[in-house]
Amino acid sequence: MTGNPCWQTIPTKLSEAQFERFVLPHLGKGHGRRGPAPTLSLHRIFNYILQVLYMGCQWKMLPIDRNAQGLPEIHYTRIYRTFRRWQAMGCIDAIFAGSVRRLRDDQLLDLTVIHGDGTTTAAKKGGDNLGYSGHKHLKGDKVVALCDRHCNVIAPFVTAAGNRNESPLLRDALPRFSQIARAIGMDLQGTIVSLDGVYDGSVG
């Protein structure tokens, strides 16, 4: 097969310039932190967060670079606490909305049809928010996503334990999508929402 692959890659590392352009403006003045500034740059901390989200590993299993003394340059708990703080402040949602806004501004979104579907991700080594899916025969996390026709994710994932029915998750996902659409000025007039057959029945 020749030519470039059509699928999209998941970013696992940002350059400092990319971080300052796309992420830093959404972290807020002071980043919601009291006390001395972190010894490790926010850029490097953010890249560690991207890495653990991509790998799907436990935080304590995150590979961390060594400093000049041969010690980990940061403890994994500090990365985790930073991530949770940014979540609580709404920074992660703001970063996501900013990326969707950029896709819209660059005319890279096709909102004629919005696709919604769910999947179960395996978590063989444990983790948070897990449940056993009898249908999939695995223990993991249930995820529902909404995408445009180019497979751009245009609403934050809604997750639950793997044994949960997907229908209630869609009920939670649609308001979050509507919130982002209003925030960035999406024009959804005439848009068709296409859902997996599991959503045809009543919410259960």
Identify the residue ranges that each predicted region occupies.
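Short alpha-helical elements
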Residues: M1-G204
